[in-house]
A protein has these predicted regions:
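Extreme N-terminal starter segment of soluble prokaryotic enzymes
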Residues: 1-3
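Core catalytic region of metal-dependent phosphoesterases/phosphodiesterases
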Residues: 5, 10, 14-147
Length: 216
């Protein structure tokens, strides 16, 4: 089986806190209440204001270990040892290479693949690919693979028929006009896209991408 995930953000205090993994029970409860009764954006704004007003840091209030344990446990609950797992970027941030490798080795899957994200050490320096070569079978900023996928009917519902389709994978939706390759991709919207991060400045492109993926 082939699985996809993204934005694990191992070791990243800001993302850990914004996802609600806070080391103070009262603070966590209040944060989650704002998230549920208002919006995620309101909760994010509230916790950022809390850090500012109390002159503290996201590192001081977040629970990185619980965040990482939850991600790894969730992956291991679904992905098998002989399966294939694609991580579509933002593997880790603000932590050592050794810590990142330790997290990866706790994932019970022997076929790991990395699509590089903007927070990854090898985003600008591809020389750093060598840091992760022992755990990943492939490392790239963009990759296409062929997969057998269900055929959709005219209403968009899944049918019993399947067809071989090309899957384009990147950390961002590859519809930006940055260079020849992405312009070519923008002209081929029928291709199935898998991407990890969806940033606000890409709002106009949203209808043309498939979003975070699950399993196939």
């Amino acid at each position: 089986m082939r699985y996809f995930t993204s934005d694990t953000h191992f070791g990243h205090p800001l993302v850990t806190a914004l996802r609600g993994f806070l080391n103070n029970g009262r603070l966590r409860a209040e944060y989650l209440d704002i998230w549920q009764t208002q919006t995620r954006a309101a909760a994010h704004a509230w916790i950022k204001q809390y850090v500012h007003d109390n002159q503290t840091s996201f590192k001081a209030i977040c629970d990185i270990a619980r965040h990482e344990n939850t991600i790894i446990d969730n992956i291991n609950e679904i992905v098998g040892h002989d399966d294939e797992l694609w991580i579509l970027g933002d593997l880790s941030y603000r932590c050592t290479v050794e810590h990142t490798l330790e997290c990866l080795r706790r994932i019970n899957c022997q076929h790991l693949h990395l699509i590089i994200g903007n927070h990854d050490r090898n985003f600008r320096l591809r020389f750093n690919d060598m840091l992760y070569e022992d755990v990943f079978e492939t490392i790239d900023d963009y990759c296409e693979i062929d997969m057998e996928l269900p055929v959709l009917d005219e209403s968009g519902k899944i049918t019993v028929a399947t067809t071989q389709q090309s899957i384009a994978m990147s950390h961002f939706p590859q519809t930006l006009g940055i260079g020849r390759r992405t312009r070519r991709l923008a002209e081929q919207l029928e291709r199935v896209r898998r991407y990890g991060a969806y940033h606000r400045r890409l709002a106009a492109l949203r209808p043309y991408a498939s979003g975070r993926s699950r399993r196939h």
